[in-house]
Amino acid sequence: MKKHNLLVAIVAVVECIAFTAQPVQAAKYSKSEAKQVKYFQRKYKNLDKAQYNRNSIYQQAPNFANPFSPGVLNPAYISTTMDYVNYYRDLVGLPSEANPDDANRSAQIGAASLAAVNASASLQAHGLINYLRPNYISENDWGIAENATLGNINFLDDAHSASAGEIVTDLMREDNNIAGAGNIGHRAIILSTRATRMGIGAAYGMSTDMLYSVEYGLFADDILRAPVKSRIVYPAAKVFPYELVGKDTPWSYSTTKRISSKPKIYIMD
């Protein structure tokens, strides 16, 4: 059985409230809701469900020696990961994010650096805190890795195979965030109201079967950008797949407005 360890990401200028609750059975769909259901069902059906392993995830495998190379991911893995990210953004009414090559390279350097030091599943993996730079990784690449790993990180133990969607969905659901129940930092990055782009990286441990996945989505210009929505709720206020809300999945409300008093939460169907 696969075991996923998730790390909470650093999130700026967003106020987040998380709480646990049981899914609510939906009432009868209106015509517009039924149309939305069919739209999201068709869109999900078209998402690639392919499994990737150490042999198929790379176009070029990393080289953990001189000369260091972070490797190059299979383009299909990158595009599928972004398809899932943008599917989940669409569910809550957010625009799609771009996937520029420079962000992918930074994310891949981050993932390969985690793999090079066989990083343990702990919060110190963010920014590679207390990890020594291998002598075959340049100071410049190490600096890029430190920044890229401040974003979303997923550790998949004994990863003989995994799909791109499996990684993104784990980060979205936040069922097993090692920072503690109720932490929704990964979800907040995926569903950011300011984000415009994301880089994707992944690498198997140099001497383990741990799969390190990096979603590099923290950029200074995005953080300073005006939000496209003032609030995000999970599950979404409109139709929402019940598969994304398990018994351990924290529900959440995120807003760009500061909340100074104890809020009251009402759940209505």
Model-predicted segments: where are they?
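N-terminal targeting leaders of exported, membrane, and organelle-targeted proteins
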Residues: 2-116, 196-197, 203-269
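Long, polar/Ser/Thr-enriched low-complexity segments
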Residues: 78, 85, 132-138
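Secretory-pathway/luminal and periplasmic proteins that interact with or process carbohydrate-rich
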Residues: 110-128, 137-139, 198-200
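Intrinsic-disorder/low-complexity regions
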Residues: 3-4, 129, 134, 140, ...
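Short coil/turn segments at secondary-structure boundaries
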Residues: 53-62, 121-132, 187, 191, ...
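A well-ordered secondary-structure block
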Residues: 27-31, 133-215
